[in-house]
Amino acid sequence: MAKEIILGIDLGTTNSVVAIIENQKPVVLENPNGKRTTPSVVAFKNNEEIVGDAAKRQLETNPEAIASIKRLMGTDKTVRANERDYKPEEISAKILAYLKEYAEKKIGHKVTKAVITVPAYFDNAQREATKNAGKIAGLQVERIINEPTAAALAFGLDKTEKEMKVLVYDLGGGTFDVSVLELSGGTFEVLSTSGDNHLGGDDWDNEIVNWLVKKIKEVYDFDPKSDKMALTRLKEEAEKTKINLSNQSVSTVSLPFLGMGKNGPINVELELKRSEFEKMTAHLIDRTRKPIVDALKQAKIEASDLDEVLLVGGSTRMPAVQSMIEHTLNKKPNRSINPDEVVAIGAAIQGGVLAGEISDVLLLDVTPLTLGIETLGGIATPLIPRNTTIPVTKSQIFSTAEDNQTEVTISVVQGERQLAADNKMLGRFNLSGIEAAPRGLPQIEVSFSIDVNGITTVSAKDKKTGKEQTITIKNTSTLSEEEINKMIQEAEENREADALKKDKIETTVRAEGLINQLEKSITDQGEKIDPKQKELLEKQIQELKDLLKEDKTDELKLKLDQIEAAAQSFAQATAQQANTSESDPKADDSNTIDAEIKQD
């Protein structure tokens, strides 16, 4: 019986790679064209599906050639081709099926399992879409892992005993990511992520294309943009030129018979110096600098704390990129691993771990933003803080906001702001059938669970009746890495203002709760209360109501402290008078949070 093989797949925006573990070592598989990377492009022509290199060559000439489909994963958008609409996961599935097919030919038997990588900032919807793409392609996706984690895994395979902090600089074809990880005893933990979802190697290619168009117009009096085939050749030559300039100081651009001019065929022969190229792309290099600083800040470490800097993505071969990294971090980046293949290698290693081929390696990823629920007053109460290691499950006891409330609404939010309205709403569901009781008595356990693939499940359970409701968060919209970083930055900028708002809301909720409690005591105790005590209670209630109207938080806090102390003395006296040791069930439960779930 053939040994189980789990494919390691880097499903990239621009290119994809597949690798396996062979004799306990990772091996990258070549496609039918003898290349180790395959363009993530699908084209349709005459009812025929074309994937990879051949499809890429049709990008400018065939309107039904589809690239960068990864950007649409997890959305409800579709692409039109072959006289029908395709969902993003259907197109991704065709790329995966192509990788699976040529992998099986290399291996010699069928393969049904895979580990697929995704950007660290991919949300639930994007991860689910990736799993679905694998399923459509005939693959059981054993694990979804973050790309920087995969890169660190590839790097750390033989160094599992050494503790180190690593920065992964990932400049892909269409996206840019920076991650800081901690490696220790075979464990890989993501400490932070940052980046730019709309920056990649393609932008450097486009700068060369723009330069070529301008030069060809000047020298040959010909506009290559007027000819789709000429533009396709220009883009191919631009990529080659970028690659050449990573290894040499000058590159010759040779494009014979690019088109027809006034005096016959246009034969282009131009030279581009590395110094010119670096000057025209300096602004792109600068755009990658800030995410490096941000990632270090989020991880709460200095550049001097880094043991290694890893490069991912073919564009990291550019000397200007390496020079900027070294200058920014005062450390030479590690160039010992192939930047095009490292992510797929890491995925293959994880596949080897799952198949039992490799041991002593443990992966720990983190959630990029805080997850919580909306509680009374619009407060965002966190359950799983940002950068919590996954998989994870966390629970908290909440209660009702109104007397005899039989239903609560659980609103799940994501973000760093202290008020729910300022964060992203992920989902909402109702828990019905709660036994009618005074506010604060029912115990509702809210649990958040994030699995190894980063998929979030939220449940709410009434501990007395056993009624339970559960949802899996599947976002209809996605968060780009820029949006994640923006949310973190906004939370930092608004921290003081948000804290004041939260303090005001919490004080108001506290006052309203005390008013409710005191009024209930007067009603329940009735004639048993000493008239003077009753008069004092009513006076205190009115004072609280007046301060609530006046919007004076500090004064309200002082009054609350005074009245709560008096109320406690009153409660003790009443208890002694009634000769009972019975106490407030809520007060005895140290696990019940002092914030009720908002009632819709």
From Swiss-Prot:
Protein's UniProt keywords contain Chaperone: yes
Bias type Basic and acidic residues, positions: 583-600
Similarity section: Belongs to the heat shock protein 70 family.
Alphabetized PANTHER family for the sequence: HEAT SHOCK PROTEIN 70KDA
Record has Kinase as a keyword: no
Name of the protein this chain belongs to: Chaperone protein DnaK
Function: Acts as a chaperone.
Region of interest (Disordered), residue spans: 570-600
